[in-house]
Regions:
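Phosphate/NTP-binding elements of NTP-utilizing enzymes
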Residues: 2-180
Length: 180
């Protein structure tokens, strides 16, 4: 690889590391139900929510369905995993299958990144409920239960579909103590 290409890659890497929005818009692909694999073009409200996530460690988003917020959380999780070593992300949802969908979205985005973004952070563990990179960062999925997240030190906690979790107060009391 010549020095000019290396320079461009280095500059792009720095831009991606500095901005999750830039990273997602430029390099993350998502699965659209009708169009298949497409580039993740964030809507303006998704950009605002992303800023909210970065500026407020405890964010609760009341929203309607099908706004792409789970996909946004997946992209944000992947950005954290790639550019911040040793981060532990936990996704709790009503059912394990729902939580697994978050990990699946992260994996899809990861698998479709250009090789230069993946070469330093290859998967060290990859199964249906976990993706751990060799930089120590990982995302794990679990179902909502009173002991969800116990014995974890969590950098980012995602509670997906929280309105549908029966014992959300008990789960929150348990899970919030895991936040590092």
């Amino acid at each position: 690889m010549n020095s000019e290409i290396k320079k461009v890659i280095r500059e792009e890497y720095v831009k991606c590391a500095a901005s999750p929005s830039y990273f997602m818009k430029k390099y993350c692909n998502i699965q659209h139900p009708k169009r298949g694999r497409i580039l993740f073009n964030l809507f303006p409200f998704q950009d605002r929510v992303l800023t909210l996530f970065q500026e407020n460690p405890y964010s609760i988003v009341l929203k309607s369905r099908q706004l792409g917020l789970s996909t946004l959380c997946a992209g944000y999780s992947l950005w954290i995993m790639l550019f911040q070593p040793d981060k532990n992300i936990l996704c709790i949802a009503t059912k394990q299958e729902t939580a697994k969908n978050m990990v699946t979205k992260v994996k899809f985005m990861y698998e479709n990144l250009p090789s230069w973004l993946k070469e330093q952070n290859k998967p060290a563990e990859d199964n249906k409920l976990t993706l751990r990179l060799n930089n120590g960062s990982q995302i794990k999925a679990t179902s909502a239960s009173s002991d969800a997240g116990r014995s974890e030190a969590v950098s980012l906690l995602i509670v997906d579909e929280a309105a549908f979790i029966n014992n959300i107060g008990e789960i929150w009391a348990s899970a919030q103590q895991t936040l590092a």
